[in-house]
């Protein structure tokens, strides 16, 4: 409030970034994201949130990304989210000046027959949005209000300039399949989502 609530200083601010450290996530930032967007109309960003070596497997990692960088923050007006690093080795190297054991979006490893790359869970979490949500003829996609009555299901959706509606749905449960009823205006259909899985629907 000290900066954004002052008319003179606020005109020099285009956005506010919420920076993540160990164990930080969407729950730590949701109040701030909502407060800034609703009271000041400034862009909001999440920086350096990423899965790390304490995670169990690919499913838990993609779930972490979808909950903390992609779906939940987008519903709170997120302008952009960034990960810890774009390219690292599969064991999180190089580490400069700290002891973080974080993953890059891409792994790049030198093996006996040369360099090899692989994609981490965060790559696919981003791809569920970036592959389907884009501008058309200079017209940006518009985020739609999206609600879920199931606590295991989180979702966000966009209206594209070509008239398509893009819905990204994630089942956060690590044990149960969830049948999701998707309702868009007068259209409705049901889709069953596996545990800790994500689906992007274009209709």
What are these regions (language model features)?
Residues 1-69, 75-76:
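Noncatalytic carbohydrate-binding groove/subsite architecture in carbohydrate-active enzymes
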Residues 8, 41, 45, 74-75, ...:
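Hydrophobic alpha-helix feature that most strongly marks membrane-spanning transmembrane helices
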Residues 13, 41, 78, 103, ...:
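Active-site lining segments that contact anionic ligands and/or coordinate catalytic metals
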Residues 23-26, 52-56, 88-94, 174-177, ...:
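Flexible loop/turn segments at secondary-structure boundaries
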Residues 30-32, 58-60, 140-141, 179-185, ...:
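Composition- and surface-driven signal marking solvent-exposed, interaction-prone regions
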Residues 46-128, 143-146:
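Aromatic/acidic polysaccharide-binding cleft in carbohydrate-active enzymes
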Residues 132, 145-185, 196:
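Carbohydrate-binding surface patches
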Residues 192-203:
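C-terminal beta-strand-rich structural cap/linker in extracellular carbohydrate-active enzymes
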């Amino acid at each position: 409030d000290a900066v954004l609530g002052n008319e003179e200083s606020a005109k020099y601010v285009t956005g506010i970034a919420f920076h993540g450290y160990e164990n930080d996530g969407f729950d730590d930032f949701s109040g701030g994201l909502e407060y800034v967007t609703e009271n000041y109309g400034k862009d909001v960003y999440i920086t350096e949130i990423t899965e790390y070596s304490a995670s169990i497997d690919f499913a838990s990692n993609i779930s972490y990304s979808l909950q903390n960088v992609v779906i939940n923050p987008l519903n709170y007006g997120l302008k952009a989210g960034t990960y810890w690093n774009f390219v690292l080795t599969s064991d999180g190297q190089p580490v400069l000046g700290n002891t973080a054991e974080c993953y890059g979006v891409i792994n790049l490893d030198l093996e006996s027959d040369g360099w090899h790359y692989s994609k981490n869970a965060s790559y696919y979490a981003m791809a569920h949005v970036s592959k389907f949500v884009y501008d058309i003829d200079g017209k940006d996609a518009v985020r739609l209000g999206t609600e879920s009555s199931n606590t295991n299901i989180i979702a966000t959706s966009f209206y594209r300039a070509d008239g398509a509606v893009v819905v990204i749905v994630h089942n956060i449960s690590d044990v149960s399949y969830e049948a999701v009823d998707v309702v868009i205006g007068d259209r409705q259909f049901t889709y069953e989502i596996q545990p800790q899985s994500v689906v992007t629907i274009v209709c």
